[in-house]
Structures are given as structure tokens and as C-alpha cells.
């Protein structure tokens, strides 16, 4: 043979895929191997080229090449093939020798075709390819689970995830997948003790003698069922056993962010970065928290660091969107959309897109984004976004239904109760009900300032300014929070107590110099105190429009 195919296998084994692809082109074009007289050799050569393309992520070319190989394989005379039909694919995983070159496996080829379709978001084609594979490896089963889940075939996804755990109980992505699909911890754990051939059982003590894996399953099931307090307790127990575990710290920070423990979540994410400064997982969630705290210097540094690690990841595009929101909403939206194009199952991308569309007064489009996030995995942010989107375009019934759905899913969540209150507060006839829901939220979680601010706003709308002041001053004794000072300043401004208003805007800015509401409120108040109409349009402001190019290179953003 003019081109030794074992050399291509060696190149692939050592990760030299560019060279393997170039050499593969020589191999498949060699006239010494005829498709008519040597279909098996032709198939083997094409598989080698396909493997090089597969590893280069040239998935469309890989699919085409593998299918050519399968076509030639069907032409191999059965009596002279010397191998069974189920063993067509070249194995490059073991040491390269003459026997490994000719030992090929059809199932492996079909798996790679399906994996390429999956990478191209062609789920149906991937499933169709895998259905012809009857005996599946662990990696084949995890792919099938993902494919079925992406297609909405949850029962099939559950079955394949469970099969993964029967083959190996430590496939943690299968544990998370099952938890998110509503499978109980007991049911998941029972899969550990069944072997893949279903003919024997092993004890849980053999698999998980210290029970950490069982606790991990329980924690993920708590997260999926919105039992966040239980999840935090279980993650804390695991962290005592595995301190400085980046994955556990990240999972804990995400739960803390969901329940509004923003300061704790920020500290947790900082610890993650101190242990592993190059991790990208959930760093967009961290960026959102920094934005809430108006900590723009840390946000800017975070985005700069993420870009230097990998500028192609969905998390990085969401973080860029967060950074640009204050400067240019259009550019921010384009980055949120890029994150979804990179990974169409990346929930923070949809949340960010929904928030930006809502701010741009496009509630119908925002609702679509929040619904997409909700379909992937329901959490409080998608519920909140949907409710506020529905209210913004007058769909009060839909808003109330969604808020109640959140309350039923999270009965111990003060935020969910507040969400129902927000819908009732939208109409004058529902304000008394809103008050009851806000107060119920505060009984459930006395330190939940979101309910305090909503209740104060309700008092203000009803003309009970004194009640609003009393409520806010009472909470300020225990919580030195800038948002409480801003709301109190707004109440005083509404009652023309301008000096008191000034003092609380200033107090808010002392706590958080980046608080945008305090800055705008103070500017407006100072105009009032000077006798200038704060609503008058400044001609200079009208002309001061910056033209920002939405396609600015990431490297220039800092």
C-alpha cells in the first residue's frame, strides 16, 4: 500500500488530527485500493479519515465520510468478509498494530455519526442512527439519554440515564439528569445496586460505603424539587467531607443565589475562583450577582478573565451581555443571543435575553425567552420573568396562573409568595390580597427585603405614606441595606420631605456607591431642590447619542 494506514492511526492516537486528515486524503484517493475489489479496505480507510475529521469537529464532513464507509461495508461479501456485520469500526483507542487496524466495529461508526449529528443539533437524525445500535456502551447510553431529553421524550431519557447508572453508578450527569426529570432519590439510588445485565445485585455498601454518593443524589433531588434549604444542608455536609471541592462549592453558590443569599453566593464563587481561576462553569451566574450588587469593577475583571480562558463558551457570552447591559442594551442582547446559539440549552442565556427584552418594552418576546428557560428547567427567575412579562402586556390571568404555579412548586419560598402578591398588586381591586401575600412571605422569611420593599410600595400606592415610612425604618434598624434607603428616600420625596429624602439617597450611596437608582434619584431630587423641573428634557442629552457597533471584538470590550 502506498500510504500505510497504521501511520494515520498512530497520528490519531497522538492527537495529530490535522496531519491525520491530510494523510487520510492520500489514503482514500490511492488507486491501489479499489472499492469494487476491496470494499473492506476502502471502508477501513474511510473510517480513518472520518475519525480525523470527527476529532477536528468537522462534523458534517465526518458524517459524509462515515456513511461512505458504511456503504462500502454493505458490499463486503459475507462469506469472505471474515468479520461479522456488527464489527465495522476502526479502533484507535488501543495500541496501534496490524490486528487493531483491521478490527472494526459498525456500532462505533454509527455512534460517531450520531455524535456528529448531536453536535450539529440534529437530534432526530442522531436518534435514528443510534436506534440501529442494539448493544450500547456507557457513552452511547448517555448520548441516548441526552438526545431523548432534548426531544422531550422524558420517559426514554429516564430509562437511558438509569441504564448509565447500572453500568457505572458514578455518572453524576445521569444523577443530575434524573433529578431534574423528577425521579426520586430513592429510585435513583436503587439503580446503583443493579448490574447492567440485571441478573445480579450489589449492595449499596460496596458502591458507596461512606454514603457520600447517596447524599449527593439527595442534594440534587432537593435542588430539582425546589427544596433549597435541604439542598444547602446536604451540600454543607458534603463540603465538610470534601472541602475545597469546586463542583460542590459552585452548586452551593447557585442555590444560595436562587434563594437570595447573594452575599454568601458571591463569596462562594470567589472561593471557587481562588481554588481554580480558570473554571468557567456557572461564572455567568456569578456575573449576574455582581451586576445586582453594582460591583462593576469586579464584573469587568471577571469578564476579562473569562475571555482569556475561552471566548467561545456560552457562559462567557452571557457574562459579556451582563457587562454590556449598562452601556448598550442592543449589544448586550446580541451577546445573550450568541450564548444561546452556542448552547441552545444554556438557561442563563434565555434568562438574560428575557430580562433585556423586558427592559426594552418587548414583553411578548421576553415571555418567549423565559418560557424557553422554563421548558429546560423551571426556577424562580423564569417564573418571575414570565409573570412580569405577562403583566407588561396585560395578560393578568396568565400572570396569576404562572405565579400560583411557582407558589405550588415552591411552597416554602417567600419569593414565590411575593410573586403572587405582585400580580394582585397590579390591579387596585387586588391590593388587599397582595398585602396578605407580602406579609405571608415576611412571616416565612422575616429578612426577605424584596417583600418589605413591595409592601412599602403598596402602602405608598394606597396613600399610606406613614405606614411605608414606619415599615422601612423598622427594617433599617436591623438591615443596613442600600435598597431600603432608596425606597425610604422615594417615599419622603413623594411627600415633599426633600431634606429627609436627600439624607437617605446619600446613605444609600455610602453603602453602595454604584447604586443606579440612588444616583438617578439624587440627581432628580437636586433638580427639585433647585426649582428645576426634573422631568424637563435636556437638549444636550437628546443629542448625546453614542453609536456603538454591536459587532465589537471581544478583545476590545475592556
UniProtKB/Swiss-Prot annotation:
GO terms for biological process: cell division; protein ubiquitination. Residues 535-558 have a biased composition (Acidic residues). Pathway: Protein modification; protein ubiquitination. InterPro entries: TPR-like_helical_dom_sf, TPR_rpt. Its main location: nucleus. Residues 519-533 have a biased composition (Basic and acidic residues). It is found in: Nucleus. Keywords: Cell cycle, Cell division, Mitosis, Nucleus, Repeat, TPR repeat, Ubl conjugation pathway. GO terms for cellular component: nucleus. Residues 519-558 are annotated as: Disordered. The keyword Transferase does not apply. Coiled coil: none annotated. TPR repeats lie at residues 43-76, 138-171, 212-245, 246-279, 314-346, 348-380, 381-413, 414-448, 450-482, 483-515. The APC/C is composed of at least 10 subunits. Component of the anaphase promoting complex/cyclosome (APC/C), a cell cycle-regulated E3 ubiquitin-protein ligase complex that controls progression through mitosis and the G1 phase of the cell cycle. The APC/C complex controls several key steps in the cell cycle by mediating ubiquitination and subsequent degradation of target proteins such as cyclins. The APC/C complex is required for the female gametophyte development and is involved in several aspect of development by controlling cell division and cell elongation. Involved in the control of endoreduplication. Belongs to the APC7 family. This is Anaphase-promoting complex subunit 7. It comes from Arabidopsis thaliana (Mouse-ear cress). The lineage of its organism: Eukaryota, Viridiplantae, Streptophyta, Embryophyta, Tracheophyta. The gene is APC7.
Amino acid at each position: 500500500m502506498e500510504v500505510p494506514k497504521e501511520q494515520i492511526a498512530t497520528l490519531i492516537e497522538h492527537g495529530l488530527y490535522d496531519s491525520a486528515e491530510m494523510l487520510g486524503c492520500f489514503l482514500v484517493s490511492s488507486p491501489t485500493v479499489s472499492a469494487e475489489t476491496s470494499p473492506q479496505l476502502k471502508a477501513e480507510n474511510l473510517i480513518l479519515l472520518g475519525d480525523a475529521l470527527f476529532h477536528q469537529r468537522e462534523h458534517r464532513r465526518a458524517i459524509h465520510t462515515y456513511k461512505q464507509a458504511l456503504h462500502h461495508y454493505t458490499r463486503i461479501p459475507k462469506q469472505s468478509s471474515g468479520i461479522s456485520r456488527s464489527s465495522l469500526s476502526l479502533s484507535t483507542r488501543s495500541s496501534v498494530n496490524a490486528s487493531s487496524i483491521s478490527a472494526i466495529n459498525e456500532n462505533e461508526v454509527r455512534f460517531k455519526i450520531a455524535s456528529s449529528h448531536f453536535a450539529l443539533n440534529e437530534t432526530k437524525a442522531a436518534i435514528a442512527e443510534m436506534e440501529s445500535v442494539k448493544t450500547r456502551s456507557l457513552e452511547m447510553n448517555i448520548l441516548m439519554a441526552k438526545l431523548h431529553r432534548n426531544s422531550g421524550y422524558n420517559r426514554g431519557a429516564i430509562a437511558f440515564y438509569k441504564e448509565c447508572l447500572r453500568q457505572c453508578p458514578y455518572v453524576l450527569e445521569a444523577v443530575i439528569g434524573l433529578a431534574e426529570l423528577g425521579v426520586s432519590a430513592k429510585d435513583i439510588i436503587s439503580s446503583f445496586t443493579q448490574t447492567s445485565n440485571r441478573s445480579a445485585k450489589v449492595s449499596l455498601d460496596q458502591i458507596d460505603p461512606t454514603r457520600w454518593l447517596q447524599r449527593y443524589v439527595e442534594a440534587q433531588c432537593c435542588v430539582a424539587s425546589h427544596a433549597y434549604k435541604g439542598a444547602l444542608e446536604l451540600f454543607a455536609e458534603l463540603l465538610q467531607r470534601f472541602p475545597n471541592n469546586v463542583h460542590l462549592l459552585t452548586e452551593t453558590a447557585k442555590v444560595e443565589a436562587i434563594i437570595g443569599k447573594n452575599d454568601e453566593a458571591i463569596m462562594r464563587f470567589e472561593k471557587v475562583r481562588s481554588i481554580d481561576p480558570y473554571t468557567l462553569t456557572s461564572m455567568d451566574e456569578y456575573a449576574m450577582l455582581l451586576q445586582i450588587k453594582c460591583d462593576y469593577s469586579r464584573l469587568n475583571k471577571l469578564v476579562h478573565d473569562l475571555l482569556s480562558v475561552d471566548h467561545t463558551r456560552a457562559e462567557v457570552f452571557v457574562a459579556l451581555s451582563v457587562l454590556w447591559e449598562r452601556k448598550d442594551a442592543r449589544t448586550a442582547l446580541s451577546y445573550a443571543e450568541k450564548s444561546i446559539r452556542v448552547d441552545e440549552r444554556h438557561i442563563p442565556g434565555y434568562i438574560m435575553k428575557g430580562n433585556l427584552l423586558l427592559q426594552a418594552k418587548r414583553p411578548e418576546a421576553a415571555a418567549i425567552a423565559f418560557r424557553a428557560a422554563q421548558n429546560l428547567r423551571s426556577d424562580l427567575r423564569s417564573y418571575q420573568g414570565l409573570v412580569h412579562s405577562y403583566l407588561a402586556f396585560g395578560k393578568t390571568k396568565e400572570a396569576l396562573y404562572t405565579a400560583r404555579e411557582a407558589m405550588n412548586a415552591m411552597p416554602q419560598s417567600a419569593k414565590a409568595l411575593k410573586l403572587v402578591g405582585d400580580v394582585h398588586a397590579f390591579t387596585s381591586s387586588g391590593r388587599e390580597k397582595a398585602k396578605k401575600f407580602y406579609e405571608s412571605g415576611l412571616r416565612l422569611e422575616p429578612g426577605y427585603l424584596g417583600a418589605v420593599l413591595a409592601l412599602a410600595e403598596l402602602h405608598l400606592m394606597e396613600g399610606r405614606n406613614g405606614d411605608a415610612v414606619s415599615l422601612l425604618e423598622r427594617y433599617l434598624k436591623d438591615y443596613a441595606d442600600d435598597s431600603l434607603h432608596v425606597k425610604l428616600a422615594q417615599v419622603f420625596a413623594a411627600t415633599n420631605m426633600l431634606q429627609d429624602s436627600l439624607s437617605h439617597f446619600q446613605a444609600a450611596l455610602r453603602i453602595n456607591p454604584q447604586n443606579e437608582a440612588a444616583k438617578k434619584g439624587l440627581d432628580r431630587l437636586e433638580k427639585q431642590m433647585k426649582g428645576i423641573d426634573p422631568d424637563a428634557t435636556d437638549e444636550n442629552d437628546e443629542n448625546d447619542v453614542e453609536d456603538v457597533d454591536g459587532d465589537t471584538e471581544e478583545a476590545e470590550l475592556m
